[in-house]
Amino acid sequence: MPMQEPQRRLLDPFNSTRTGTPHLKLSANQTGPWCLHVSIPDGLFLSLGLVSLVENVLVVISIAKNRNLHSPMYYFICCLALSDLLVSVSIVLETTLILVLEAGALATRVTVVQQLDNVIDVLICGSMVSSLCFLGAIAVDRYISIFYALRYHSIVTLPRARWAIVAIWVASISSSTLFVAYYNHTAVLLCLVTFFLATLALMAVLYVHMLARAHQHAQAIAQLHKRQHLVHQGFRLKGAATLTILLGIFFLCWGPFFLYLTLIVLCPKHPTCSCFFKNLNLFLALIIFNSIVDPLIYAFRSQELRMTLKEVLLCSW
């Protein structure tokens, strides 16, 4: 079903916040004086992208440098870093292109600008999809390592991991290309929102199950050492905090953007929804922030990777 306004392109509001042709065409009467619009300065946007770029490049270099990290788990982490890198770079690239065009420093044809916009949109959408896929892949990998520890190396082999990585990248690029081609259909947005909810549900179920298994192990150890109450209390607090941080950051950083897509389908012209649409830049900034946080959660907690990172930094100096 063809989509109504406001949806010419998924990231058009991102462009229109800086151009003179507003995509949403919101008037004061539509949004009301109570509407809260959080403005994200271009400098902050570019700074977040630069931090994400440097951080994720260091993760990729560290994993590539250390042969001890050439395992399925670290391959998934490396691909997550690469996806996060592309998310940040593509969004920042579009921001930079808009600023350059606004300043009149780049004179080019409309068709060329449209082609550049298509390429950047494919990068943005593809990197977002691949980032979500690799977050799910890391959760599955950790689940297998805990519940099938003795068979882990026979289940998660390097060839299978490589095929999974190739499949994720191919699916991400293909889906993003289809999205750009059929951006004006509600089915596209519904597929993206469904994919996000499925990834969130998968991660929640797997990590909660892993937390329950770890709790059982802690209970058994506590009974052996006769320190059951203290160990249980400490483990519950630490495990709950870790799970809350892991899923909480994922939901807070990605949730607003996919809520934005959902509201475009459900209430494209409602005043409350129209007010929400005006904050797309904030939602994109949260996604870039997630690209900064991901290495701290998934990569830098590894002592081996931290040691390699120190070597990389020392060599660069």
From Swiss-Prot:
Gene: MC1R
Protein name: Melanocyte-stimulating hormone receptor
Top-rank taxon: Eukaryota
Keyword Chloroplast tagged: no
GO cellular component, one term: plasma membrane
Extracellular side: 1-37, 94-118, 184-191, 267-279
Side Cytoplasmic, residues: 64-72, 141-163, 212-240, 301-317
A Pfam family: 7tm_1
Organism: Chaetodipus baileyi
